[in-house]
Swiss-Prot record:
GO terms for cellular component: cytosol. The gene is trpS. This is Tryptophan--tRNA ligase. The keyword Ligase applies. Pfam families: tRNA-synt_1b (PF00579). ATP binds at residues 21-23, 30-31, 159-161, 198, 207-211. It comes from Corynebacterium efficiens (strain DSM 44549 / YS-314 / AJ 12310 / JCM 11189 / NBRC 100395). Transmembrane segments: none annotated. The keyword Chloroplast does not apply. InterPro entries: aa-tRNA-synth_Ic, Rossmann-like_a/b/a_fold, Trp-tRNA-ligase, Trp-tRNA-ligase_bac-type, Trp-tRNA_synthetase.
Length: 346
């Protein structure tokens, strides 16, 4: 039996891992429908590891108190959305020192040119300017690789913007295994079934993002329902008044249909058929109602979790304990393979 077999055998489910940054006061609708909604389903069939990557968050300036508060809030939101600590391992990245330690090893295995070709770094550094871009942003992909490889997941759900980073992760895993001996699982990336790409309400050809140019294009899950309803009803559509699903020619209308479909479970085709002879006002009202029906109980659950900080921290401590046991063991194998002298007790 190899070292990898200790974590995964034919009798145990495959492991899946993903994370979401604590860089805003609320996760947005795109975060949920494009990722977290699928995490909730995956925890029923996989050995699921989900984490809050606060180390990644500090690649840009953060207010310390805000970061701490957002980390707690992020955990509460994930639990309120349906991440079950009995079926998933939920933890905070910085609670596991092995993430930063393995990141350094992987950084030393990464060529400068290889790292320089990462599209996300090039785009962000061009936008921010060299003087305002941290070296942490440059090494972000190697930290992401460490996040993944520490837990030997077979599957990693990723969006299109992270595919290049996952390919680097796979390359580094193979490079290490070939050079020093097999330690790492080489993970497969996948887009989970049912994942919905949600677009900006004011610019429906751009992905919904907290960094969007117009805040009215964003739906935050914890926003007052009246605010969210107003944003849905002011969403950009078009002038022909026909409700049809056509991403190329009717991106705004198509986006609203996808949102409503994902929230209600009705197929887009069935929704379109039901709007025959109706205008955009009906589509927007129904989508706003579906959103409110989803976020109202969510906010209540979130408030309940936030009212018991000690219980939240207990859940994260249990997750960190389990994650730490695995990560520490894998890091020890890495250190042994590369020739580090192991510490000994006196």
């Amino acid at each position: 039996m190899t070292s990898q077999d200790n974590d995964h055998t034919a009798q145990t489910p495959a492991r899946v891992l993903s994370g979401i940054q604590p860089t805003a006061d609320s996760y947005h609708l795109g975060n949920y429908l494009g990722a977290v909604k699928q995490w909730i389903d995956l925890q029923n069939s996989y050995d699921a590891f989900y984490f809050i990557p606060d180390l990644h968050a500090i690649t840009v300036d953060q207010n310390p108190e805000e970061l701490r508060a957002r980390t707690v809030s992020g955990a509460a939101q994930l639990l309120a959305l349906g991440i079950d600590p009995e079926r998933s391992t939920l933890f905070v990245q910085s609670h596991i020192p092995a993430h930063a330690e393995l990141s350094w090893v992987l950084t030393c295995l990464t060529g400068f040119g290889e790292a320089s070709r990462m599209t996300q770094f090039k785009d962000k550094s061009t936008k921010q300017g060299a003087e305002r871009t941290s070296a942490g942003l440059f090494t972000y992909p190697m930290l992401m690789a460490a996040d993944i490889l520490l837990y030997r997941p077979q599957l990693v759900p990723v969006g299109e913007d992270q595919r290049q980073h996952l390919e680097l992760t796979r390359t580094l895993a193979e490079r290490f295994n070939n050079r020093f001996g097999t330690v790492f699982e080489v993970p497969e990336g996948f887009i989970p079934e049912g994942a919905s790409k949600i677009y900006d309400l004011q610019n429906p050809t751009a992905k919904m993002s907290k960094s969007g140019e117009n805040p009215k294009g964003l739906i935050n899950l914890l926003d007052d329902p009246k605010v969210s309803s107003k944003r849905i009803k002011s969403a950009v559509t078009d002038n022909d008044g026909v409700i049809a699903f056509d991403v190329a020619n009717k991106p705004g209308v198509s986006n609203l249909l996808v949102i409503q479909s994902a929230l209600t479970g009705e197929s887009v085709d069935k929704l379109v058929a039901g709007y025959e002879g109706k205008g955009y006002g009906a589509l927007k009202t129904d989508t706003a109602d579906a959103l409110e029906a989803f976020t109202t109980p969510l906010r209540a659950k979130y408030d309940e979790y936030m009212s018991d900080r000690a219980e939240l921290e207990r859940v994260l401590a249990i997750g960190a304990e389990r994650a730490g046991e695995i990560a520490t063991k894998v890091l020890a194998e890495v250190y042994d393979k590369i020739g580090f002298l192991a510490p000994r007790s006196r």
